[in-house]
C-alpha cells in the first residue's frame, strides 16, 4: 500500500479505518462523484477483482500519491447506487456508513494495507522505507500508510492548464487515426520520471486506448532493470515506482549494456532507439500515442542525444520540467516553440509538518528495481528466500557468454567472473563474433562486446546461481521461462550493472547465494579442464560505499 497520500478538498470515507470488517485489496474506488490519483481519473466501478488498483508512494522516494476528489455537477448524485455497492462490499455495516454520510455527496474509497510481493520485498531492504520514522509509533499494525490533507501541487495551475490544452489538441488527432508522440525533458532530479508517469495516466484518462512508452533512460529504466532501451504498451495507470511494475519478459527491448552513454557509443544508442521507434510505427494501432522516457541529461552528449531523438520522432509535444532556475536548460534550436510546454515544478517534497529524510541515491534506486524484477520468484517476500529459488540448468555446449571489453579476463577466470553476476538474457544474433572457450567444443562460446557488435535483443535478466565445471553446467535464476525458448539465450554482462549487494547479505543463516562446484585436481575430470578452476579475481570497475 502507499506510504503517504495527499488529499485535496475531499470528503473521504475510509472503510478500513472506521469499519474494520471490510476486506478488499489493494486500492479500490467506486460510487458516484469524481476522483483522480496522480491525474488518472478513477472510474465508478463495482466490486470486482479486475477493478482493483495498486498505488505506492514510499516516504523515502519523496513525492506522495496525490488524490483529488470533486463532485460531478453534470450528473445527479445517486445515494441509492452508493447504498447498493456498500451493501456489496460491507454487508454488516453498510447502513451505519450511509447514516454517517447523510446528505453529503462523497467519493467512497476502500483501502487495504496488503502489500504485494515486490513492495514487501523492497520495504524490507531499507529502514523506514514506506513511512516517515517520526510517525511510525502512531500506527499500530504494519504495513504502514499515512494520509495528509495538504494542498500539495506538483505543477503550477497555469502550467497545468497549458499542458491540458496541448493534450486536448493531440486527443483531437486520435479520432483521425493519427499516431502522436510526446517527449518529456528535464534535468537530473527535476521530476521527469514522475512527469512521464503522469502523462501516461492523463492519456489513459483522456480516452487513449493504445499508450506506448519508449523507455530510453538506461540509468533509471521504468519497466526493465537498468541498461535496456525498451518499448512497452501500457494498459493500466502507473501509480507506483519502477520496482512495482517490472515486466518478467520483454517483447521489444534491447540491451545497451551500460547505465550511461559515452562518445563512442552514441551511434549504438541511437541505432537501438530508432529501431524501437520504427517498431512502434509498425505495430501500434491507429490513434496510438508514444511517450518517450528520455534520460535526465540535457547538456553536452545528453543534448546531442536529445537532438537525435527529436530528429527521429518529430514529437507533437515536448514537455520540459525543471525545479532549479540555475540548472542548465535544453536548447530546442529549430524545434517549434509552440509545441513546447515549460513546467516549473514545486520544489517542496514530502508532507507538511514532517522533517525531510535523506534522499535515496541513484544506485540504490537501480538496486530496488532489480530486486522488484526478481521478487516474483521469491517464495516469501524477503530477499533472504532467494537461496530457495530453483535455477535453470544450461549446458556449457549450448551457451554463449558475452563480456564487455573492459570486463574481459583470461579464459581460466571466465567462470569466476560471471558467477553471482546479473546478466541480460538476449536472443542469439548471427552477426555476433564468437569463439569456443579454450578452443574446446564442450565449453561455452565467448564473445567480446565492443562498438562494432550488433544490437542484442533482450528478453529478460537472470543471476548466475552457480557453475559446475565437472558437469559442464551453468545454473541461472530468472523469471523468464527458459523451457519455452527454442534455444538458450546469450548470457550478457553489462558495465556497472551488478547483482544488488542485498542478495549476498540478507540471508541470516549466511547461506551462499551461489555454487561453484569444481573437480579435485587429482581427479580424472580435471585433466581436460586446463585450469578453468583458477580462483576468482576482482572485476569490479569501481568501489562504492554508502549510508542510508
From Swiss-Prot:
<keyword id="KW-0808">Transferase</keyword>
<protein>
    <recommendedName>
        <fullName>Polynucleotide 5'-hydroxyl-kinase nol-9</fullName>
        <ecNumber>2.7.1.-</ecNumber>
    </recommendedName>
</protein>
<keyword id="KW-0418">Kinase</keyword>
<keyword id="KW-0539">Nucleus</keyword>
<keyword id="KW-0547">Nucleotide-binding</keyword>
<dbReference type="GO" id="GO:0006364">
    <property type="term" value="P:rRNA processing"/>
</dbReference>
<dbReference type="GO" id="GO:0005730">
    <property type="term" value="C:nucleolus"/>
</dbReference>
<dbReference type="InterPro" id="IPR045116">
    <property type="entry name" value="Clp1/Grc3"/>
</dbReference>
<dbReference type="Pfam" id="PF25467">
    <property type="entry name" value="NOL9_C"/>
</dbReference>
<dbReference type="InterPro" id="IPR027417">
    <property type="entry name" value="P-loop_NTPase"/>
</dbReference>
<feature type="binding site">
    <location>
        <begin position="186"/>
        <end position="193"/>
    </location>
    <ligand>
        <name>ATP</name>
    </ligand>
</feature>
<dbReference type="Pfam" id="PF16575">
    <property type="entry name" value="CLP1_P"/>
</dbReference>
<dbReference type="InterPro" id="IPR032319">
    <property type="entry name" value="CLP1_P"/>
</dbReference>
<dbReference type="GO" id="GO:0005634">
    <property type="term" value="C:nucleus"/>
</dbReference>
<dbReference type="GO" id="GO:0051731">
    <property type="term" value="F:polynucleotide 5'-hydroxyl-kinase activity"/>
</dbReference>
<keyword id="KW-0698">rRNA processing</keyword>
<comment type="function">
    <text>Polynucleotide 5'-kinase involved in rRNA processing.</text>
</comment>
<dbReference type="GO" id="GO:0005524">
    <property type="term" value="F:ATP binding"/>
</dbReference>
<keyword id="KW-0067">ATP-binding</keyword>
<comment type="similarity">
    <text>Belongs to the Clp1 family. NOL9/GRC3 subfamily.</text>
</comment>
<dbReference type="GO" id="GO:0000448">
    <property type="term" value="P:cleavage in ITS2 between 5.8S rRNA and LSU-rRNA of tricistronic rRNA transcript (SSU-rRNA, 5.8S rRNA, LSU-rRNA)"/>
</dbReference>
Amino acid at each position: 500500500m502507499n506510504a503517504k497520500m495527499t488529499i485535496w478538498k475531499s470528503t473521504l470515507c475510509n472503510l478500513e479505518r472506521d469499519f474494520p470488517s471490510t476486506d478488499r485489496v489493494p486500492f479500490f474506488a467506486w460510487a458516484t462523484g469524481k476522483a483522480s490519483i496522480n491525474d488518472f481519473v478513477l472510474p465508478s466501478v463495482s466490486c470486482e477483482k479486475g477493478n482493483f488498483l495498486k498505488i505506492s508512494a514510499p516516504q523515502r522516494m519523496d513525492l506522495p500519491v496525490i488524490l483529488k476528489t470533486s463532485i460531478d455537477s453534470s450528473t445527479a448524485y445517486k445515494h441509492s447506487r452508493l447504498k447498493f455497492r456498500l451493501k456489496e462490499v460491507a454487508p454488516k455495516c453498510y447502513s451505519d456508513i450511509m447514516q454517517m454520510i447523510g446528505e453529503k455527496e462523497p467519493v467512497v474509497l476502500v483501502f487495504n494495507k496488503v502489500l504485494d510481493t515486490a513492495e514487501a520485498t523492497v520495504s524490507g531492504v531499507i529502514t523506514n522505507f514506506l513511512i516517515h520514522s517520526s510517525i511510525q509509533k502512531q500506527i499500530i499494525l504494519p504495513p504502514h500508510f499515512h494520509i495528509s490533507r495538504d494542498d500539495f501541487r506538483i505543477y503550477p495551475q497555469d502550467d497545468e492548464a497549458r499542458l491540458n490544452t496541448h493534450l486536448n489538441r493531440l486527443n483531437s488527432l486520435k479520432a483521425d487515426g493519427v499516431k502522436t508522440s510526446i517527449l518529456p525533458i528535464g534535468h537530473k532530479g527535476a521530476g521527469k520520471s514522475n512527469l512521464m508517469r503522469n502523462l501516461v495516466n492523463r492519456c489513459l484518462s483522456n480516452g487513449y486506448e493504445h499508450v506506448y512508452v519508449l523507455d530510453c533512460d538506461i540509468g533509471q529504466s521504468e519497466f526493465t532493470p537498468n541498461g535496456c532501451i525498451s518499448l512497452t504498451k501500457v494498459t493500466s495507470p502507473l501509480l507506483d515506482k519502477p520496482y512495482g511494475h517490472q515486466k518478467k519478459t520483454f517483447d521489444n527491448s534491447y540491451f545497451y549494456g551500460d547505465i550511461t552513454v559515452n562518445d563512442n557509443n552514441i551511434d549504438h544508442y541511437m541505432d537501438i532507439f530508432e529501431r524501437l521507434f520504427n517498431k512502434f510505427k509498425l505495430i501500434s494501432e491507429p490513434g496510438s500515442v508514444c511517450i518517450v522516457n528520455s534520460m535526465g541529461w540535457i547538456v553536452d552528449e545528453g543534448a546531442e542525444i536529445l537532438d537525435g531523438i527529436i530528429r527521429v520522432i518529430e514529437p507533437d509535444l515536448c514537455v520540459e520540467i525543471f525545479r532549479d532556475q540555475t540548472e542548465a536548460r535544453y536548447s530546442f534550436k529549430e524545434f517549434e516553440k509552440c509545441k513546447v510546454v515549460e513546467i516549473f515544478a514545486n520544489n517542496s517534497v514530502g508532507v507538511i509538518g514532517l522533517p525531510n529524510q535523506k534522499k535515496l541515491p541513484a544506485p540504490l534506486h537501480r538496486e530496488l528495481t532489480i530486486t522488484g524484477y526478481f521478487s516474483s520468484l521469491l517464495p516469501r517476500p524477503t530477499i533472504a528466500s532467494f537461496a530457495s529459488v530453483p535455477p535453470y540448468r544450461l549446458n556449457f555446449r549450448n551457451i554463449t557468454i558475452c563480456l564487455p571489453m573492459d570486463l574481459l579476463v583470461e579464459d581460466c577466470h571466465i567462470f569466476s567472473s560471471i558467477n553471482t553476476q546479473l546478466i541480460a538474457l538476449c536472443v542469439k544474433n548471427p552477426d555476433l563474433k564468437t569463439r569456443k572457450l579454450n578452443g574446446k567444443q564442450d565449453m561455452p562460446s565467448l564473445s567480446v562486446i565492443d562498438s562494432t557488435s550488433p544490437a542484442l535483443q533482450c528478453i529478460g535478466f537472470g543471476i548466475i546461481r552457480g557453475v559446475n565445471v565437472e558437469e559442464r553446467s551453468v545454473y541461472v535464476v530468472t523469471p523468464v521461462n527458459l523451457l519455452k525458448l527454442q534455444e538458450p539465450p546469450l548470457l550478457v554482462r553489462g558495465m556497472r550493472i551488478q547483482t544488488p549487494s542485498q542478495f549476498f547479505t540478507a540471508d541470516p543463516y549466511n547461506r551462499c547465494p551461489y555454487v561453484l562446484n569444481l573437480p579435485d585436481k587429482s581427479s580424472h575430470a580435471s585433466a581436460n579442464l586446463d585450469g578453468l578452476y583458477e580462483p576468482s579475481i576482482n572485476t569490479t570497475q569501481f568501489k562504492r560505499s554508502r549510508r542510508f
